[in-house]
Amino acid sequence: MNPVQVGAAIASLRKKNNLTQAALARILCVSDKTVSKWETGQGYPEISLLPQLAAAFGVTVDNLLCGEYAGIAVIGNLHSDYIRNVDANPHPRGQANITSSTRYAGGSVSNITFNLSKIDPTIPLYAFGCVGNDADGSYILSRLQRHFIKTSGITSVNSPTGVNELISTPTDGVFLIRAAGANVMFDPQNIDVFSLTCRIAHFGRLTLFPRFWDQDEEYGCKLARVLHNLQEANIQTALSILANKQAPKSEQLALVLKYCDHVLMTAEALGSICNTTIGQEPLSDYTAIQSCMQQVLDLGVQKKVFVFIGDYIGFCLNKGGSFCSCRMKEVAPEEFVHQFGLADDISSGCLFGLYHNYPDIEILKFGLGVATVSVTSKYNDDGMRPKREIVQIINENPTND
C-alpha cells in the first residue's frame, strides 16, 4: 500500500475506535503531528510501531497494512499496447510509415486499476491476470507497481504477453490488431480467493480466458465456482459484458450470473442476450430496455444490472425493482478523442460508486463522468482525473435523469 492508503486505514481505524489523534499519539508515545502526517499520507509509521499501532486498534498488522475487506480486485486481460501513428491510410498493397510509437500497459486490468488509482489513491487495488516471461510482461508489472497496485495475483508464463497494436491513421481513425497471448493461459485456479480481503472483485473480458469456461461438475464451469467462493468470502462480485463476436453465450452466462452481485454491460450486449435489436438502432423509449434488464436479473443477478449506451446514457435496475436512467450531454464531435477502452472507463466509475455505496443514480452519473473525461480532448490531456475534478466535470455537463 502507498502512504495515502496506509494513512486512510489508520484514520478509519482510529475513528472506529473513538480515538482522537492526540489520544493515539499518547498510546504510541509520539506527537499528534506525527499521527497527522501518517493520516495525510506524508509518511509511513516506523516498523517498530506497527505491532503497537495494530494492538491499539484491535487488528492484526496485516489488517492494518492491507485493510480489512477493503479495496477492489480487478481480474481480466493484460496487454502491452503499442500506439503507432502512421503518415498514410492503409490500403491493400499500400505502404505507410510509422511516424511515432508509444507503449502503454493496457487491458481491462491496467485500464481500470490505473483509473481508480487516480480517482481515489486511498483505495487498495489488486490486479489478477496473466503475462509472459518477457519484456512486455515485465513492463506491465512495473507500471502497475509504480501505481502501488498489488501484482501478486498476476501469473507469469512461458508464452508471449498479449499485445494490442493500435494504428492511428491521418483520416481513417484507429485500427486495433490484437494478439491474446498469455491471456489464454489464465486459469481460475490462479485466483487465491481465500487470501483476498477486498470488498469487490470485478471480472472483465471473460471471453479471452477459455479455461474459465472449463466444465465444473458442481457449478457448471470454473468461473462460476470462483464467483461462488468469492461471495462465500463476503466479497461482492461484478462482471462486465461486452458485445462482440466472442461474447459469452446465453447458456454460459446462465451458469455464472447467479453468482454475480452486479453486472455492467453495453446495450449491444443486452440486446444479444435477450435476442432483440436493442443497441443496434435508436432507442425510442426505455420500456424495452427495462424489460430486457429484468430478464438479466431473472437469470440470477443478485443486486444490480447497469446498461450503457456509448458514453452518455446509462440505466440501472436493482433487485428491488427500482429503475433509473441518466443522460449526459453528448461530447461534441470536434472534442471527441477516441472510444477504445470506454467500457473500462465506465466500469471504473461504477466500481468507485459501488465501493462507496453511492445511490444508483449517482453511480450512473459518476460512470458517465469518468467516460466524459476519457473521450473528451479538453479533459483527458493528463489522463484520468481525481474524484473532485470528475464531480466538477459532471456539474459542467448537466445530466438529464
Task: Indicate where each model-derived feature is located.
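Ribokinase/PfkB-type carbohydrate-kinase core domain
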Residues: A70-L78, L141-S156, S168-K329, D381-D401
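Alpha-helical residues within the helix-turn-helix
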Residues: K15, R26, A55
